Amino acid sequence: MTFNDRIAELRDRVRQQRPLIHHITNFVVMNDTANVTLHIGGLPVMAHDREEVAEMVAAAGALVLNVGTLSPDWIEAMIIAGKRANELGIPIVLDPVGAGATSLRTSSNRRLLETLQVAVIRGNSGEIGALAGMGGVVKGVEAVVEADDPLAAAQVLARQYHTVVAVTGRRDLVTDGSRVLAVDNGHEWLKTLTGTGCSATTVIAAFTAVERDYLFAAAAGLACFGLAAELAAPQARGPASFKVAFYDAIYHLAADQIRAGARVVDLSTEQSKAVAQS
């Protein structure tokens, strides 16, 4: 079975199992991430009240923590839900939106990482660099200066917190601190829509809900997400029509499209090779 066969099988497994993805996420992207969860094959729930999060996460396949619209109450809810998820072996995917932009965002994300065992961190180069202490400037929630060495920053962060780190950008990099996979799928029009990084995070969460190799799950999720964008772009005339076509492409993404179009490169070997061709 090739790497792309495995990605296609994992995508089908999400559709078959329909895992519940519990989001504690930001107001800006709630509707979009709920729809993307549905389109990829999962079931979304947005629940952030401290009185219910422990009960809600117990029914979930994965937990998404996204600090985009940050508040102290939500951080406490994230910790309550995250501790319960850890007790039950439910994977947590952290989206450290705006880490490095303010001291509150940076410290809140570090608190989550120090308190909880996170399965995957998905962020842009600026956010990952800021959390790793290796450069990166974030203005608002966008990286305006990348980390000095995004891969090195991701590896440092992965080793420090015993997690998988996915740095998204022109080329996505996914590492557990030693193994490294690069994902070359995507399209520049993703940058014209707010919240696409958050949507990528929820796809990763859906994949981790049914696959315990979190490095593979994160890379597979990003490959499917980026491939859907590539398939949508020729049908679009601008950002609005691209968004509609993108949702359709995620929903209809088929195994044969994944086998033909996913582009994942294994950077862990001495001579980097396209694992899809192995």
Curated annotation (Swiss-Prot):
ATP binds at residues 122, 168. Keywords: ATP-binding, Kinase, Magnesium, Metal-binding, Nucleotide-binding, Thiamine biosynthesis, Transferase. One of its GO terms (biological process) is thiamine diphosphate biosynthetic process. Its cofactor is Mg(2+). Substrate binds at residues 46, 195. SUPFAM superfamilies: Ribokinase-like (SSF53613). Pfam families: HK (PF02110). GO terms for molecular function: ATP binding; hydroxyethylthiazole kinase activity; magnesium ion binding. Its EC number is 2.7.1.50. It catalyses: 5-(2-hydroxyethyl)-4-methylthiazole + ATP = 4-methyl-5-(2-phosphooxyethyl)-thiazole + ADP + H(+). InterPro entries: Hyethyz_kinase, Ribokinase-like. It comes from the Bacteria. Pathway: Cofactor biosynthesis; thiamine diphosphate biosynthesis; 4-methyl-5-(2-phosphoethyl)-thiazole from 5-(2-hydroxyethyl)-4-methylthiazole: step 1/1. NCBIfam families: PRK09355.1 (NF006830), thiM (TIGR00694). Catalyzes the phosphorylation of the hydroxyl group of 4-methyl-5-beta-hydroxyethylthiazole (THZ). Belongs to the Thz kinase family. This is Hydroxyethylthiazole kinase. The gene is thiM.
